[in-house]
């Protein structure tokens, strides 16, 4: 589905491979000279923490937070090649806040953990899409870490964009989990409890 659409949403529970699949497609498109760069981003909200409260400079704050993106890259490319591509700005990993004002052309763009965007952040990110680019938005609407009363940008995007031609929505469920078999059981238990 990613290959057939310029904008794809991958929505589902933890462990379904949403981020890995998106990054693997991006790496494949780059290797086949179909995009010039890979841009990976996440909102700076995670389980109640914000970057400003973490110790160190911006790189110290951002790198651990972006670790899941690095891990998915490491499943697709050798470490030395990742380092070289990062140095040459072929791969860019940056917080969502750094995307404002940009046009992302000739790129494969991934927004991970999109359930933690606000409606305005999501709109801002989606409107960065430039010519000859593909964008994948991944998230889990059951793991929203935003303050109470703030609607998730992912939830609002699903509602607003569900009927827009050319936008693809791929929905995963607990049956799609590829992590440890206990993850499926945990997700199902929470689904039952939350009903």
Where are these regions (language model features)?
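Conserved helicase motor core of SF1/SF2 NTP-dependent helicases
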Residues: 1-111, 115-195
């Amino acid at each position: 589905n990613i290959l057939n659409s310029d904008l794809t949403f991958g929505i589902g529970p933890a462990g379904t491979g949403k981020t890995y699949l998106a990054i693997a497609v991006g790496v494949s498109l780059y290797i086949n000279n179909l995009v010039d760069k890979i841009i990976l981003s996440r909102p700076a909200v995670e389980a109640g923490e914000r970057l400003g409260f973490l110790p160190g400079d911006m790189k110290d704050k951002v790198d651990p937070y972006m670790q899941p993106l690095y891990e998915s890259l490491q499943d697709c490319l050798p470490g030395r090649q990742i380092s070289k591509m990062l140095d040459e700005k072929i791969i860019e990993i940056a917080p969502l806040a750094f995307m404002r004002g940009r046009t992302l052309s000739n790129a494969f763009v991934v927004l991970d953990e999109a359930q933690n965007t606000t409606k305005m952040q999501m709109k801002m990110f989606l409107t960065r899409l430039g010519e000859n680019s593909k964008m994948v938005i991944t998230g889990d609407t059951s793991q929203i870490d935003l303050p109470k009363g703030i609607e998730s940008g992912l939830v609002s995007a699903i509602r607003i964009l569900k009927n827009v031609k050319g936008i693809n929505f791929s929905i995963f469920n607990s049956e799609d989990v590829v992590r440890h078999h206990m993850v499926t059981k945990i997700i199902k238990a929470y689904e039952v409890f939350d009903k």
